[in-house]
Structure formats: C-alpha cells, structure tokens
Amino acid sequence: MLITPEKLYKQRRNFLKLGAGALISSSVLASKLSALNFTSDTNPNKLEISDEELATNYVNFYEFSTDKRKAVSLAQNFNTQNWKIDISGEIEKPLTLSMEDILKFPLEERIYRFRCVETWSMVVPWVGFELRRLIEMAKPTSEAKFVKFTTLLDKSQFPDQDALFPTIDYPYVEGLRMDEAMHPLTLLAVGMYKKALKPQNGAPIRLVVPWKYGFKSIKSIVKIEFTKEQPKSTWESYAPSEYGFYANVNPNVSHPRWSQANERALGDFFTKPTLMFNGYEKEVASLYKNMDLKVNF
C-alpha cells in the first residue's frame, strides 16, 4: 500500500532554474528545497515518520566506515561540488549530467517505508523524481535489459576505499531490471525531510527503491549504465548465499544468519511484523509473477 496517495505523489513541485554556470552545492540545493511549496497532508495514512535525527544519523555507508556513528562523523567534509553523472551503455548517445541538469527534473516529496536487511526500518519523506524520467531522456535501445549504478570512487574522500584491507570491493555497484527501474515507485532522491541529502545519507543523489532492502538504494551515484546482461551487485559478489540480486523485502525468506519476519523501527523498543515487499505488494508483486522468490531472493 502506498503511504503517499497517487493524487498527491504525482503532484510536481518545480525548482526555479539556477543561473547559467552556477555551482550546485548542498547549501544552494537546501535553499531551493526550503522554497518548495509542500502540501500539508502528504501522509493521510498517518504512519509515523521517523525522527529526522535518527534517520540521518543511523546509517550504513561503508565507504566512510562500517561503524554507523563514525560514518556520520567522517562524512561531514564530503565534497559534492561539480558533481557529474555519466550515463552510458545501451542508449542512443552517452551523456554526462551535472547536478544543474538533474535539478531540471520536476521534484516531488514521497513518504516511503525503508527496510534495512539488518532488520531495522524507518519511514522517510524523500524529495526526488522518478528514475524512469531520466531513463526516458537517455533513450535506451532494445538491447538494454538492466540498469547498473556505481558510487563515487575517491580514496581521498572515502577512508575505507583507501584502507589496506577494504571492507568490500569498490566502487559500490548495484543494479535493477529495466522494469524495476521504470516502475513509478523507483526514485532518484536529492533530499529528505525537505532538505538536501546529507553526505552520510548519499548526497548529492541516491537511488530509493522502497520494496527492496536498503542496500539496493545505492548512494552518491556517479555512473548509470544500461546493460544487456544482469550486473553483479557488490553484496551479491561479496556473499552470494546471503545477498541476492533482487533483495526484495520478504518476511518468508530469512537471511542465513537471522530471520526477516520482524523489524524494529528506529526509536522503537518493540518489533513488528515485516510486510511483504515492505508494504508495496499491490504495486510491485506483478513484476515477479511466476518467480520463485526463495530462489530469486
């Protein structure tokens, strides 16, 4: 079930165009976000939005650190000036987008559930635009079956990338099937809580796929590639018996080391049952018709 109703989540809130040659910094984006005319009732189901302080400070961003609190601290000097996103692969013509280009897409707020594979969860008001808008602009060919995403590789900014023994292989890579990428729930986010994304939350731009575990929602994207073959995602490569390509939230498929049947919302003491597809079963179940979700996890 959608948290934000169709009528509201399809409303578009446009940014004013920035002047030619302007640098797109977090502070500039924050000022644009604060000027947006958000509607007062974007959560008619009255689900409790997670505390902003908790949601922005309890994070997984291994490029900075495997320690959630330390990652927040180390992220504070992250430089996103002059950010570029290369778009390539099975498309009519490769292109590079600046954040100025990105901010030309109509932005909107969407309130989504977010479920981590570690069994914690939250409800976040994201600001962004549907990924399919960018895909339509890129004009993929009939050969494009998947979309591959890559996080920034910069050892000068990411301590774990520069470590003698990095925690995982970098750069971080994720992927979606084309129909998943084109689904209207799939979002490219530039903000949350009506503010620009903080560095630890994936600034300046990240993916949000609300029916999948959080590790699919790749942060700080610098490359989007359209491919013929299914890309090998980072966690799938690291531990294929524990992390599958699809990573759909499924209370009936346990992680090898823990159950996924329940979750604990940030700030709560008690757990609650995990919803199939994180509560978006009606919207996305048809994408996986006739698939064995215990095999394709």
Swiss-Prot record:
Primary localisation category: periplasm
Protein name from the UniProt record: Protein-methionine-sulfoxide reductase catalytic subunit MsrP
UniProt-annotated binding residues for Mo-molybdopterin: Y62, E63, C116, T151, N201, R206, S217, I218, K219
Source organism of the structure: Campylobacter jejuni subsp. jejuni serotype O:2 (strain ATCC 700819 / NCTC 11168)
UniProt cross-references to NCBIfam families, sorted A to Z: PRK05363.1 (NF003767)
Enzyme kind, highest EC tier: oxidoreductase
Entry cofactors: Mo-molybdopterin
Signal peptide span: 1-35
Pfam families: Oxidored_molyb
GO BP annotation list: protein repair
Function: Part of the MsrPQ system that repairs oxidized periplasmic proteins containing methionine sulfoxide residues (Met-O), using respiratory chain electrons. Thus protects these proteins from oxidative-stress damage caused by reactive species of oxygen and chlorine generated by the host defense mechanisms. MsrPQ is essential for the maintenance of envelope integrity under bleach stress, rescuing a wide series of structurally unrelated periplasmic proteins from methionine oxidation.
Family statement: Belongs to the MsrP family.
GO molecular function, a single term: molybdopterin cofactor binding
This enzyme's EC code(s): 1.8.5.-
Family matches, as InterPro entries: MsrP, OxRdtase_Mopterin-bd_dom, OxRdtase_Mopterin-bd_sf
Record text on subunit structure and interactions: Heterodimer of a catalytic subunit (MsrP) and a heme-binding subunit (MsrQ).
GO cellular component, one term: periplasmic space
Reactions listed under catalytic activity: L-methionyl-[protein] + a quinone + H2O = L-methionyl-(S)-S-oxide-[protein] + a quinol; L-methionyl-[protein] + a quinone + H2O = L-methionyl-(R)-S-oxide-[protein] + a quinol
Lineage, opening ranks: Bacteria, Pseudomonadati, Campylobacterota, Epsilonproteobacteria, Campylobacterales
Post-translational modification: Predicted to be exported by the Tat system. The position of the signal peptide cleavage has not been experimentally proven.
Localization (cell): Periplasm
